[in-house]
Amino acid sequence: MNWNKGGPGTKRGFGFGGFAISAGKKEEAKLPQQSHSAFGAASSSSGFGKSAPPQLPSFYKIGSKRANFDEENAYFEDEEEDSSNVDLPYIPAENSPTRQQFHSKPADSDSDDDPLEAFMAEVEDQAARDMKRLEEKDKERKNVKGIRDDIEEEDDQEAYFRYMAENPTAGVVQEEEEDNLEYDSDGNPIAPSKKIIDPLPPIDHSEIDYPPFEKNFYNEHEEITNLTPQQLIDLRHKLNLRVSGAAPPRPGSSFAHFGFDEQLMHQIRKSEYTQPTPIQCQGVPVALSGRDMIGIAKTGSGKTAAFIWPMLIHIMDQKELEPGDGPIAVIVCPTRELCQQIHAECKRFGKAYNLRSVAVYGGGSMWEQAKALQEGAEIVVCTPGRLIDHVKKKATNLQRVSYLVFDEADRMFDMGFEYQVRSIASHVRPDRQTLLFSATFRKKIEKLARDILIDPIRVVQGDIGEANEDVTQIVEILHSGPSKWNWLTRRLVEFTSSGSVLLFVTKKANAEELASNLKQEGHNLGLLHGDMDQSERNKVISDFKKKDIPVLVATDVAARGLDIPSIKTVINYDVARDIDTHTHRIGRTGRAGEKGVAYTLLTPKDSNFAGDLVRNLEGANQHVSKELLDLAMQNAWFRKSRFKGGKGKKLNIGGGGLGYRERPGLGSENSDRGNNNNVMSNYEAYKPSTGAMGDRLTAMKAAFQSQYKSHFVAASLSNQKAGTSSAGASGWTSAGSLNSVPTNSAQQGHNSPDNPMTSSTKNIPGFNNSGNISSAPVTYPSIGAQGVNNTASGNNSREGIGGGNGKRERYTENRGGSRHSHGDGGNRHGDGGRHGDGYRYPESGSRHTDGHRHGETRHGGSAGRHGESRGANDGRNGESRKEGFNRENKMDPKVDSSRMDKVDSKTDKTPDGFAVPEPPKRKKSRWDS
């Protein structure tokens, strides 16, 4: 084979010019490349070894790198081929011995080689062996006698101890891990630290002057009043209600019994309520009565609406919020979800009265919540921590809060909010109305209720928080300390005959003295106090349990933890230091379903404790004697905080509002129609709020129409006769509208030489041919001749308007200018005058005739009388002008107020020019109530 055809000196290489390969040898030159495939090694090439020896090293060197690469690929490709061919079935060739063996093999012969089936077979064998062993044990146990199963077997207590030993963390509440981790600038997670919220600092309420407010709005429906005591018991039993407390209101059984107005009832019907739930039947009357309440009911019982509906009526009776005021009602709840849910209910029912609600909870935008609080909201629904944050940052305050609700108090305590809850309650005025709702009534909740509620009514719906009624409490009021001793020695034998007696004394010295005195009387007793050794205590308690000693004299060290069912009588010889200790004392009897009696001996010096005792008895449905109540009333704080009975404030259903605010769209029923100072007394009720209310404009129009019809009354005949001179001389009717001035009288006045209105009637651009004034001036000074100005009222006197033609002409020019500048208001006023003709003055024609008939006399120079009549009718003029401006500005209160000031400011001392300047910012005027 000739590899190089170029001759001597030419370069060897590949290519068409580098070598020539014969047709027979062409395949052999490619064999080395094919030999490095995945199916064979380099040595398998037969043609490579037959090539000429000189060319072998040169050719091998050229392809050395490629050979390396191919060897690597071949190594990995072998693995891929092996792995890919693992699952392929083996099919032997035709007519081969393996093929014959394959066909002769049984189909399930390889099932023994399946590892899963082998494992399952082993498990079944083990189970069979275990069953056989258990059967043998049962046979042995039956043959053996004298073994007690109740001793040998593990009982519940042993199982509990074993479980606690194996699970030391059982019962520990694991803190939930927060998924929302925060990361620093490098992307490393920041370890979450629980935010510690300090409670609000204490506050001295005696330094704050709180305005009084009304709490009681409940007027009992006559159907409920007519119920007999037995029917009342049956109704509560039917509703599955248990009520305790001092004089609880009777429950209602329908919405009509609550006395809600139509606006609230419309929202209730819209929310698809058909009848109140059991907790609402009793809770709404309690809350409407202004009483503090403990509501114990499960979730979903309707307790949210039970405190929202009375809250709306409570808010509507108070003054509107001023800038910087905090909320009137605060609802505190444990979680954000519950906060949003209650907030939605408050908005749904609050829009009936255009009340604003704000939800304040952790996780929300602090800035947005602070902004909403600063804009003003009557209702705040909050979680404790976030409310405290806002109060500390002065975004709001609790000065005006008079309705406080704690919902799901037990969950707040479980979440560790006890101190925050107490600090919020301590920051609200002490005479507030407080409602506490909980699903359970544990000791912590009971203690909180005693601390923050005053004379609460406890309403239990369902089978939660069953009160212990096995203890009967009897209070004996004695004159002095020696009377206690006489009472005890007289009754002690009787008590010991029915069971063991436990005597409680406050001080150790008194306990020892009482024990020694009783021993001298021959009574067998034991003594227990804190200075005794533990062995002595144990011996006394053991003897008392065995009934070896029937009487035990003890201090409060025995009040807690003594569980002796044989105690039938507890005697509080000295009153306890506080009501908590008293509760634990009387709890020593009436245990394990046994009945017991607790006696408490009081003297007149125990009036402080008597108040606590009254509330304790009322909370336990025990009888409170009149003597005990009289003794408690000697205490100033109890007398002040005691709930007041009597009927609630009238709700004015269908008419005016509660107290300071009227219902939207309704006229006031109780304002004084004759007093001009009260004309705008209800104006503040219609100020537009910042909330989005679709029908607010309609309500305002209806409100002003109602005000218009109620405030302006038709003139009587006596007013016409009394104001005859004024009606013609000045063009004002007795109601103060400029609706008719005769043309003839004006002309006569022009011809008369001494008429003070000689040029004014010509120059006034408001007269038309019919004699009606279409554009009325905004302010009218009183006119007098030769100083008769003094006869006008003080509000109407103007400087420099006396006698003299020059001054009269100046008045005429100024008056005309005034009319011209306020022509728009005058046109509207003219509309009001025409409305007056059709609505209030059917006899306007006769009055016009009367004015024409007496025009000469009236215009003949009776300027003094003219001034008097103008002064007398000024109040009505103000009303009529106000009416015109109301119509002009389409019931806009802001424009109304500014124009009202323009109308009413009659003390301008400017000598020349009566044009009213730009209205200043509205200040308090005499129209405000």
Curated annotation (Swiss-Prot):
Motif (Q motif): 253-281
Modified residues (Omega-N-methylarginine): R12
GO cellular component, one term: nuclear speck
Binding annotation for ATP: A297, K298, T299, G300, S301, G302, K303, T304
Positions of the UniProt region annotated as Disordered: 25-119, 182-203, 662-682, 723-929
Sequence ranges assigned to domain Helicase C-terminal in this UniProt record: 487-632
Positions of modified residues (Phosphoserine): S58, S96, S104, S109, S111, S185
Known EC number: 3.6.4.13
Compartment(s) of residence: Cytoplasm; Nucleus
Protein name as catalogued: ATP-dependent RNA helicase DDX42
Name of encoding gene: Ddx42
